[in-house]
Amino acid sequence: MVNERRFNNAFFKGGSTSRLELEVLNSLYGELSSECFSPINGENFVFSQTKPFDLIELEQLLQSVGWSRRPLRRVRRALDNSLLKVGLWKHDPKFPRLIGFARCTGDGILEATVWDVAINPVYQGSGFGKKLMTYVIKSIKEM
């Protein structure tokens, strides 16, 4: 379940985050989720290590940054063999949108390599790439 400290009171405009709101966030993004403070007023973003990726949505994100299309079965296999996968989602209770992605491979103890870092071009230049990398590095260190 989402820890109340991970989603602060600023996440919802109404003030404090209720238990029901935390349950909704948990159901949308999984237990390893946290708010990404947004430089864009009125929009909320969430990092998640546990929300499953829609492979087509992920490939659309990667193509939007200029990468060539890859077979979905290979993408699935790469995800399955990754040490860490992080999605950055534009929060919408009905339809969260993937706007950023990164994954890591490694031995889980000493070494890790970051791969496939992408931020939707609409959100580039707003600091989301730096926020994503900061989150990834922090998550790897906590493993």
Residue ranges with predicted function:
Residues P52-L55, P121, K130:
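Alpha-helix N-capping/helix-start residues
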Residues R74-A118:
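A conserved beta-strand-loop-helix scaffold within acyl/acetyltransferase catalytic domains
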Residues M1-S34:
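N-terminal mitochondrial targeting presequence
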Residues M133, K138-M143:
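Conserved GNAT acetyl-CoA-binding A-motif
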